[in-house]
């Protein structure tokens, strides 16, 4: 027989267990969204949406800029004698800010557990949030917006948000275009941004008809999540949409940003950088984490899924463009697969430095790259990729934390991007968190525990600039 006091004790324990279970379930529920779908039936008028989001814009941008300035030094400090392929100066120096009183050497000497326990992981090494993470979507640099508006009369400006990173940290614009089929010509862009209005004039006689049609499709705008004709858009006037080369300008990148479409809920989605299409022909994985196996798959995926945040329901409302695999997708990918890396005159046919052309610093940097730095474990010559994905387990260094409405929990497996032409495609890492090559060296020195000396770091940067 259970005594009253014992019964009371069991009741209390039972209630406590229920409360703990409920708390755990609530915590689990907080990690899930209420739904995987975006709202389709918008009852708010566009005029009201426009007024509300325009009024909120200054506060949103101010909060995000505070995050950027806390993470990194955004000043314009060009490197002497180091430029991209068409002459834009490279930014130099480590821009990620250290915790007060810390040095890079002291930090590198600590274990991941120590850094995590003492909250010493540099803010600039955390995942970088979207300029407005709860809203997300494509955001373009102003120079892309201005040139497309000038040439096509199409406006890529969002009324609710502007691009966040300063121009000096972005790729040169317009980017040069190199073709694997005509290496004798060098840059075939004539210094122009290729658009639907000038592609025929620039490429008729250089491409075959399939490639020319593929380029036309890559330059043709189609409706997208933020740029469409419905009331649920982020352009002031109804938009014809976005073209592939609005982000991949001239087959390279302009640094435009977005959120991955394959994660829910919203706060767990990762910011993504626009990657270059140079060297598509030697790559076997596409998408930073999706691991699509062909560029044909990715071209279809962009139109059907990524343009609409991975939501085919809302895509139906806004105007999804279904590409025909046997012709349109083939044409688009045939052009993408002849986009070449920029010239690297100091490299030999094996992708390594020619000692007769390289500086001593570059040669020392190559030794670090293939030795102590462990870089070549993943980035293998001649194109400096292994066409695999790797998980750096960055979550070893920090506790999960909310950063301006983005939940930072780690990165997961990420594609090994080619390093050929790396100097032409800042900022770095899949989400733009690293502004310079020096930042990148410090990041991997910490994550991989390689404990490079200051001179070794400088030499490694010199080598990567030569790739």
Regions found by a protein language model. Name each.
Residues 1-8:
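N-terminal secretory signal peptides that target proteins for export/translocation
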Residues 7, 20, 24-26:
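Residue-level detector of intrinsically disordered, flexible termini
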Residues 25-467:
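Periplasmic c-type cytochrome electron-transfer domains
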